[in-house]
Amino acid sequence: MLIIAQEPSQVTDKLRRLLDSFGIQYRVLYTNFETDVDKATISLASSFSYSSDEDYKGQPLFFNDLSVPLYWELWTLGITTYIFDGQDRRASIILRENLKDRTVKQVHWFGQGEKVLAIDDYNRYGWRTKQRLLDDEGQALIDIYFNRNQEEVLLHYIQEGYLIDQGSEGRDRIFSGKEDLTKAVLTQILKSDEPIICMDSNLIPILQLQQPNRLVYCSASHDGLEHIQNQVNHTLIANYYPQEERRSGLIYLAGAEQEGTKTFTPQAMVMTASENIEGLAGLVDAFPNIDFHIAAQTSMGPKLTCLEGKVNVHLYPGISQEQYQELLRKSSIYLDLNYGSEVSDVTLDAIENEHLLYGLESTVHRPYYKTLPTVYASYEELEQGFRQLLQQADFYPNALASQKEILRLAEREEILAFLTRLEEEKDDDLHL
């Protein structure tokens, strides 16, 4: 199965997690020029840079192992690392996300006055994949893509728009632009018997010519899809919609990730853009056996930081995507108690990860949550609901089943059956 999208997004992440949970093998093609990819991911550039399994082996390059000219040296100031030629700084090294590992993400090469003239990109396997050449104004001129042997394989003349494939056959291919290159890459990687889930509507006319009978479109929203539905075999919707808003002819995926095997753990989480979380301090004191994980994409205000000394409170200011996914995995409770806007679709992410959504009628971010068994009219009722959860062994599975029924989440077995039939080419009965 091949997923095609312009770039990684919440929707592609959800779809990949769903397929992983089903054990369905897939590949992903992003129609961008990313070169730091895993083995299941292809981009327009990586399709030229990576050619064997060996290319996906290795570790990020430790900064001190970076090759530099004789007598040049690396000099570190905290997390900032420079390359010196003995007199002047000739480059700066940008480290990968985990700064403690001190591995190389980019090298910015300097000209006169430390003006950046070129940028080298390094991948997670420790080799250079790209060099960008800049003009005197810092504008990109050319992107040069390399294979593991550091041979030039693709040139992208950015301002003119065209690209040159410097393949091993000794004969250059010229592409007039990104669309021309995309067609060539699709021809190269598509398998004749492979179903496609496409998230880029601009590619549908091209894909209709190459894979007309097993073409599925996937969108976050169900709005404005009428013209697309007529061009594909099936349409998947990743976001949640209440039953009364759903439209015929569409397959809704929200909730299909639930495997029904999660056991209750006394871990509660909330993602907030506001320091005002109704009743949080009282819950923290009333239920010392519950760990409260409070996350934000930015810094936190004093109403939250003052809780940091509590042994059952864990704060995550500026939370990373990896930390967020880990909280979703290990928590069983989501607190929809924060005022202000909902951060992304965090409540839906929590529900899809089999969290019980606890909240007040005055704080929940979606009106249809008010009918859930763990949404209450008062704080006192909310506290009592927490006590029931901790004292009654069957409360969590029963309330979770009720939550799923009220929200009419997708049935996992039906989605699995659909995807299985899609893989097996039984397209005459591909519907739910």
Q: What residue ranges belong to the model's regions?
A:
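N-terminal subdomain of nucleotide-sugar transferases
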Residues: 1-67
